Amino acid sequence: ASSAASDVYKRQDIIHGIEDACSDDALWLIPSIVEYIKETGEIEFADQIVPYADKGEGTVYEHMMRILDFSAKEVGATGICLGLRADWNDCLNLGGGESALVSFLHYWAINNFIELAQYLGRDDDVKKYKEMATHVKDVCNNELWDKDWFIRGITKNGKKIGTSTDKEGKVHLESNAWAVLSGAASEEKGIKAMDSVKEYLATPYGIMLNAPSYTVPDDDIGFITRVYP
């Protein structure tokens, strides 16, 4: 985990060795570190000094805060996290657009971090990140909910991906699964979202990532529209 933390950049626009960032990468590190500390009991790990990938150094705990603050800052016009170079689904063209998945992942990571901060007695950080979590949750529920499910994101041109009016790519798995897994969705919305996943995405062979399948290329949405159904 400390090796992974050293891949966090003090300059936060550099990931994967290029001058831009994948919006989800660093966020996965937060719950990984928290779970590592829980399992091992190595509380002192949070204060271990590790270098940043570009220059300088900081504690693992400071790296975690830097990650959360970066995602809080890198948001679009609606307040949803920017997709930057890519999120988990590299086939979506979210450069300049906004990612529902990353906002839900951000919310999940914040709450994992709060648990650690509470255990360490860092009350100022608990207060700061509880406020951040409340804001992220409110934005997600206000901006991403569409009738019976959560949309997948918003392109740089303002087109919403995965809405009730879309003929193709109407429902996407990642945003709805993570709305529930993260705890950001209310019970009512979470149940509706999972009912929609069952209705549109569940098959005898597993759950599809989106449906109905894309058949018409749309470069505003991305390469996902060019992948064979």
PLM features: what roles do these ranges have?
Residues E19-V50:
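Hydrophobic or amphipathic alpha-helical targeting/insertion segments
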Residues D13-D20, Q48-G58:
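The substrate-binding groove and active-site-proximal loops of carbohydrate-active enzymes
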Residues D13-D24, C91-S103, G158-S182, T225-P229:
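Solvent-exposed loop and edge beta-strand segments that line ligand/cofactor-binding
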Residues V60, D87-N111, E115:
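Hydrophobic, small-residue-rich alpha-helical packing segments that form membrane-like cores
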Residues D7, L105-F223:
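Catalytic cores of carbohydrate-active enzymes
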Residues S6-D7, I43-P51, V75-N89, A211-Y214:
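Core alpha/beta catalytic barrel or barrel-like domain that forms the active/cofactor pocket
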Residues A1-A5, Y9:
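Single conserved hydrophobic/aromatic residue that forms the stacking wall/gate
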Residues S3, I30, V34-I37, V50, ...:
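Hydrophobic core segments within long, regular secondary-structure runs in both alpha-
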